[in-house]
């Protein structure tokens, strides 16, 4: 059976070339509506559905997807594509508005009434902020957004009060991970109000040496200041990763090549494999490609990291386990 993994990938991810370290960037804006209790305090589901209707009316050009009308597998696919958060699934009256290429989404009734997301691979944080801000302006023309002249935008979580903005960059950091530098880096940037998390944000697991770097606080700084400082933090981490890769290539080349080719051999020959192992093997193969140890046609790290997740493997109508299907996809696409 041939597996067309491209059907499971958002258009914005497919249309851009991959880079050695930066995988994607995201801007998220949290907003709430005046005269509505917050989502976690709804008395009935109807409170939530009223908010959904109001937000949908304000953004008529987006496609609405109500989570109560979707099965669990479809919801988890949207989590895997970063269109919604795992927390949104837990809400009884939740929805998401999505644009054509899925680079823009608006979650409704997560922790806050509205969470605007703009995502891209080769787009700067400032450009993404401009896109998210445009949606914010459109909402503001139709809805009464909670705002305080002294504090800024009012949010459910105190750490989001102010700009209500979380900026984040997803980085592939195999060198720093292999050399066990990530804990020290996380401690360092934490002192400046920035944090490193797993692939799906707070409390999520790290897969394939992939980390999300983002700001922690939004009060007392402008959107531009947050973006500029995060960009400096990310550039320093990228610099450190490049230095480590150079050292691995110069002083530990045989060991690094052995690691890369072992992972390549496993991915090309495995008959069953877990998500955790597959992600780390893919990461090491990508490292080998970036260091010019190997050349693979059409190797797409970002796309494969999405396509091998369980929600996309449960579609197949056969008796194979998820681990077997994952191995089939990897053998087929890594040649």
From Swiss-Prot:
Its EC number is 2.7.14.1. It comes from the Bacteria. One of its GO terms (cellular component) is extracellular space. It catalyses: L-arginyl-[protein] + ATP = N(omega)-phospho-L-arginyl-[protein] + ADP + H(+). GO terms for biological process: phosphocreatine biosynthetic process. Gene3D superfamilies: Glutamine synthetase/guanido kinase, catalytic domain. Catalyzes the specific phosphorylation of arginine residues in proteins. Belongs to the ATP:guanido phosphotransferase family. This is Protein-arginine kinase.
């Amino acid at each position: 059976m041939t597996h067309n993994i491209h059907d499971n990938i958002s258009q914005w991810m497919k249309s851009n070339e991959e880079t050695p370290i930066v995988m994607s960037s995201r801007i998220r804006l949290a907003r709430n509506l005046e005269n509505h209790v917050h989502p976690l305090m709804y008395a009935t589901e109807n409170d939530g559905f009223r908010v959904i209707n109001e937000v949908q009316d304000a953004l008529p050009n987006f496609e609405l997807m109500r989570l109560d009308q979707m099965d669990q597998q479809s919801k988890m696919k949207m989590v895997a594509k970063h269109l919604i958060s795992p927390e949104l699934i837990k809400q009884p009256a939740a929805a998401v508005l999505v644009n054509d290429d899925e680079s823009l989404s608006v979650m409704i009734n997560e922790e806050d009434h509205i969470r605007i997301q703009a995502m891209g691979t080769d787009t700067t944080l400032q450009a993404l902020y401009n896109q998210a801000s445009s949606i914010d302006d459109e909402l503001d023309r139709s809805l009464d957004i909670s705002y305080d002249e002294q504090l800024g935008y009012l949010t459910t979580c105190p750490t989001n009060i102010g700009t209500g903005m979380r900026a984040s960059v997803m980085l592939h950091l195999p060198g720093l991970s292999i050399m066990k530098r990530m804990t020290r880096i996380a401690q360092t940037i934490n002192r400046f109000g920035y944090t490193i998390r797993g692939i799906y944000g707070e409390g999520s697991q790290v897969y394939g040496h992939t980390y999300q770097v983002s700001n922690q606080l939004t009060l007392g700084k402008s959107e531009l200041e947050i973006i500029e400082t995060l960009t400096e933090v990310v550039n320093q981490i990228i610099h450190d990763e490049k230095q480590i890769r150079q050292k691995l290539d110069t002083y530990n080349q045989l060991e690094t090549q052995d690691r890369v080719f072992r992972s390549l051999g496993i991915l090309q020959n495995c008959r069953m494999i877990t998500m955790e192992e597959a992600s780390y093997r893919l990461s090491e193969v990508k490292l080998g490609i970036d260091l010019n140890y190997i050349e693979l046609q059409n190797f797409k790290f970002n796309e494969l990291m999405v396509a091998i997740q369980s929600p996309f493997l449960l579609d197949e109508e056969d008796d194979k386990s998820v681990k077997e299907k994952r191995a089939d996809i990897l053998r087929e696409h890594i040649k």
